[in-house]
């Protein structure tokens, strides 16, 4: 299986899975800390208090709104389930809400991270889920090496000093 495997990309679900040399607590922090997340997620900051039923908003402040939704299930450092409404273009806005689930499982001295993007319409444009590979590659690189990964997405909204 490839490092990032699309386990099921048919119909209304896309699943990505990777193994990262880190602890569940550090991985949870990288997913939920706005400044840390911006380092591997195209400069996008996500603001939330990460409690069950709370809202979140993702954006590149002063540049573009990316997504918003609700934290449906918050179980640190194991599982985060969120509704996901994309905001970055009229095409993705018209799709409505989908769901993103982050599952963290310790495996020896590493973690398995599984990201499930589901409840997508059958005709969902890959623009909705096509960035996950770059985001997860950046997350893995940051946690394992402390370095930032240059990807087309990370360079798009990078601020000076944000990309190594």
What are the residue ranges of the model-derived segments?
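Hydrophobic/aromatic beta-strand elements that line small-molecule binding cavities or substrate pockets
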Residues: 17-18, 68-73, 98-105
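Hydrophobic pocket/interface hotspot
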Residues: 27-28, 37, 56, 71, ...
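A short, structured loop/turn motif at beta-sheet edges
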Residues: 24-25, 72-79, 103-112
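Short beta-edge strand/loop motif at the mouth of beta-sheet-based domains
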Residues: 15-16, 34-70, 77-79, 151-162
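Beta-strand/loop substructures that line and gate deep hydrophobic ligand-binding cavities in soluble
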Residues: 13, 89-134, 139-141
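Surface-exposed helix-capping loop/turn segments at secondary-structure junctions
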Residues: 141-151
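Short, P/G- and charge-enriched loop/turn segments at secondary-structure junctions
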Residues: 3-5, 56-58, 88-92
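Hydrophobic ligand-binding cavity/cleft-lining segments
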Residues: 1-47, 164
